[in-house]
Regions:
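Primary recognition of N-terminal secretory signal peptides and signal-anchoring hydrophobic helices
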Residues: 5-34, 41-49, 167, 185, ...
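PDZ/PDZ-like domain segments forming the peptide/carboxylate-binding groove
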Residues: 35-38, 99-138, 142-146, 406, ...
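Stable alpha-helical elements in mature extracytoplasmic
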Residues: 41-48, 65-73, 77, 89, ...
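Structured segments of extracytoplasmic/periplasmic soluble domains
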Residues: 47-55, 68-80, 84-87, 123, ...
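Extended, small/polar residue-biased N-terminal targeting/export presequences
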Residues: 53-116, 163-165, 169-178, 186, ...
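PDZ/PDZ-like groove recognition
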Residues: 70, 107-121, 125, 197-203, ...
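Cleft-lining beta-strand/loop regions that shape enzyme active-site pockets
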Residues: 116-118, 126-128, 132, 140-143, ...
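Active-site-adjacent mobile loop/cap segments within catalytic or ligand-binding domains
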Residues: 339-363
């Protein structure tokens, strides 16, 4: 694992606001504040603070005055990425980059009957026997049925070493578990190998050793047989360390410029790399509107060098660079010092990066499109509540199912992605047409085979099966199986 050293390029994400940051070699800002008629501005501000503290009738607290003054200075810049961190906030910030938090080690989703356990990591929840599919209905003595997810998770999380009592429902029966909270390390790199030699790697943060984990996983996949295509999933990845993005680029490009940077003086200080390699198979980067900063650095570089094809939706557009500067009095100041461009001088800030293959319809169509493009020929999906498997592999993506009047409806774009069909929208008639090699169907607003809900067109599987010979499906009300 790479250590985080003073002077090393790194980048961070503020825990509270999910702010994305790039950190270059730390350097103290030049103390070049111009003197004004009123004297030294810093001394003047200090004098005002001291006079208010010592003479104001309310006997104000010096720390409170200082915090307000700091916040006012930062707000005057109009820059959402420049921030002051207290020591506690700095720790939260560092934990966010490393995907660490204090809790019991589960990924959850709010469902009508409680808090659904979607994934269990290594940690106290697994040791206590909590399983995927369990539903939390009470935390302590407080019901979480119908509660906002944020409220429920705040009850579950807490101080390390403390215990939380959970009431769960499993297969219709209630049971109680007492779990001790501890610091949880959520995996930042996971992967799986699909049939046809398609390897899939998901990176959720550019932590200090994410590049090493990706490299190790890639070598493991190679040892299992020839790789015909590699998918690197950066969706919802807010960034991390710039050095990690650079090292990851070396897995796919021999040498070059990672980014161009433009500082306050208009000078370009390019970040370069060498000693890389070129993979003998096509590489596909999955991105979306929450792929930001280091995710955009890597994607932009691989696009410019024709080393990868980006699939999904336009990225976030976080193209500025921050230094995190430790303060002598504790905490740190994160200051925007540069903007960056891709190797071919494409802007990123506030505009994002366009994918090479645009996909509409959300998570599952994005994933299936990437898998099909990489070489997976057919799909078998199984959905239990929100837990989805694709060709036998558990994935984090999911989709909503409507069950009404004895019919099962799925999003039209999910069905299209399963079948490899195209979706054409007719704005005049407000109808959607699905067409593949073995059939086609038109869904009109007044038709019986579709429903429009929350802006999404859902289509009846029983009706679709009459038009698409390759479609197979079954639904017992709990588990939906869908193939094509």
């Amino acid at each position: 694992m790479k250590s985080i050293r003073k002077g090393k390029m790194w980048r961070r994400t503020a825990a509270a606001a999910l702010t994305l940051t790039l950190i270059l070699p730390a350097a103290l800002p030049a103390a070049a504040a111009a003197l004004t008629v009123g004297g030294n501005p810093a001394e003047r501000a200090k004098e005002v603070l001291e006079k208010l503290e010592s003479q104001h009738v309310s006997a104000p607290d010096a720390k409170k005055l200082s915090d307000v003054a700091i916040q006012a200075m930062i707000e005057s810049l109009g820059d959402p990425y420049t921030q002051y961190f207290t020591p506690e906030e700095l720790t939260e910030f560092e934990n966010a980059v490393a995907n660490r938090y204090v809790g019991i080690g589960v990924r959850v989703s709010q469902q009508p009957d409680g808090v659904y356990i979607a994934e269990v990591f290594d940690g106290p929840a697994r040791e206590a026997g909590i399983r995927v599919g369990d539903v939390i209905v009470k935390v302590g003595e407080q019901s979480v049925v119908g509660a906002p997810l944020g409220e429920a998770t705040s009850l579950i999380m807490g101080e390390p070493g403390t215990e939380v009592k959970l009431r769960l429902v499993r297969d219709g029966a209630e049971l109680e578990k007492t779990v001790k909270r501890q610091q949880i390390q959520v995996p930042v790199v996971t992967g799986k190998r699909f049939e046809g030699g398609v390897a899939y790697v998901r990176v959720t943060s550019f932590s200090s050793d994410a590049d090493e984990q990706v490299a190790a996983l890639l070598e493991y996949f190679k040892s299992q047989g020839e790789i015909k295509g590699l998918i690197v999933d950066l969706r919802d990845n807010p960034g991390g360390l710039l050095d990690t993005a650079k090292e990851m680029a070396r897995l796919f490009v021999k040498e070059g410029t990672l980014i161009h940077t433009k500082n306050r003086n208009g000078l370009d200080e390019p970040v370069t790399f060498s000693g890389g390699e070129v993979q003998p198979f096509p590489v596909y980067m999955m991105v979306n509107g929450s792929s930001a900063s280091a995710s955009e650095v890597l994607t932009g570089a691989l696009q410019d060098y024709k080393a990868a094809i980006a699939i999904g939706t336009k990225t976030y557009g976080k193209g500025s660079v921050q230094n995190v500067i430790p303060l002598d009095q504790g905490g740190a100041l994160k200051v925007t010092v540069e903007e960056y461009l891709t190797p071919h001088q494409r802007p990123v800030n506030r505009v994002g990066l366009e994918p090479d293959i645009a996909v509409e319809g959300g998570q599952v169509p994005e994933l299936l499109t990437a898998l099909r493009t990489a070489g997976v020929g057919s799909f078998s999906l199984e959905l239990r509540r929100i837990n989805l498997t694709v060709n036998g592999h558990a994935v984090e993506d999911s989709f909503r199912v409507l069950r009404e009047g004895g019919q099962t409806y799925v999003p039209a774009r999910v069905l299209a992605a399963v079948l490899g069909a195209k979706v054409a929208w007719d704005a005049v008639t407000s109808s959607a047409k699905l067409q593949s090699q073995d059939g086609s169907i038109v869904y009109a607003p007044s038709g019986t085979g579709s429903k429009l809900q929350d802006g999404v067109t859902y289509v009846s599987l029983s009706q679709a099966a009459e038009f698409f010979r390759s479609l197979t499906w079954s639904d017992d009300g709990q588990v939906l199986k869908l193939g094509g």
